[in-house]
Amino acid sequence: MKCTIPEQQKVILIDEIGGYDVIKYEDYPVPSISEEELLIKNKYTGVNYIESYFRKGIYPCEKPYVLGREASGTVVAKGKGVTNFEVGDQVAYISNSTFAQYSKISSQGPVMKLPKGTSDEELKLYAAGLLQVLTALSFTNEAYHVKKGDYVLLFAAAGGVGLILNQLLKMKGAHTIAVASTDEKLKIAKEYGAEYLINASKEDILRQVLKFTNGKGVDASFDSVGKDTFEISLAALKRKGVFVSFGNASGLIPPFSITRLSPKNITLVRPQLYGYIADPEEWKYYSDEFFGLVNSKKLNIKIYKTYPLRDYRTAAADIESRKTVGKLVLEIPQ
């Protein structure tokens, strides 16, 4: 398979901190690769909340910075030292700078070779699910090892990660208490496995949690909201409960005294996916789990909407409005 690789490509980048107006769709150099790297022509890339953290300055990055964290596409060039991939292989992978027509990644991963003949819809599904499914898998295995009978509080239960967590928690036999802002979102969360529902816009979350757990509190809280729900998560946990904080959708959690964890022996963790897949064996384990669950259709990845790459500014506004349900995907121009 021969492919003419251009010198310039279309990307989504930021070169300053700010609002949606700093998001730019521009020409940018196609990256050059080393002897151990792959050059991938992207077809689809997933939209994640983390992009907003770079744009707002919550996470530092060198400017200009091409956004994006996951994609699927085709290998169009490889370094001389690469032996495990061939030009023409279809792949799904996790890397920086995937809001682009071309991205590079080490041949050692995290990248997975897809079966020959993978369809366009499957490419979209893998790009939509890779980061969030692996996040949910690793968090429920390692950040807090969910056990049968556990009561788990889940915020943003109808978001991309939330819907995956609902399904995995049900598979593990946990009782999921889903929190969302509308009855429509809660209905979807229930369809995906939630057992108890709390409408955050009109119900007292803590009161409902204590009601559902007979006053005991939850074994774990999976909280991607951040500032607005931090105190609720702390209060809702039972003795020896685990607080899994993995997002800042409402803003950064203000500084607090660590002694506040002592009265109930609470464990607070702030995990990130990359810490669980850094080793090749870890990557293989979780990517195999991903394929098994998705290809067997045991796990349903709900795609909210697919946008052209140039319309990422609209997608960013949609996901940050916290009104979307499921995953947002960008289609890359070919």
Curated annotation (Swiss-Prot):
One cellular component term from this protein's GO annotations in UniProt: cytoplasm
EC identifiers of the protein: 1.6.5.5
Molecular function terms from GO: 2-alkenal reductase [NAD(P)+] activity; mRNA 3'-UTR AU-rich region binding; NADPH binding; NADPH:quinone reductase activity; zinc ion binding
One Pfam match: ADH_zinc_N
Catalysed transformations (reactions): 2 a quinone + NADPH + H(+) = 2 a 1,4-benzosemiquinone + NADP(+)
EC category name: oxidoreductase
Protein's GO biological process: cellular response to oxidative stress
Entry keywords, A to Z: NADP, Oxidoreductase
Superkingdom, taxonomy of origin: Eukaryota
Family to which the UniProt record says this protein belongs: Belongs to the zinc-containing alcohol dehydrogenase family. Quinone oxidoreductase subfamily.
Protein name, UniProt field: Probable quinone oxidoreductase
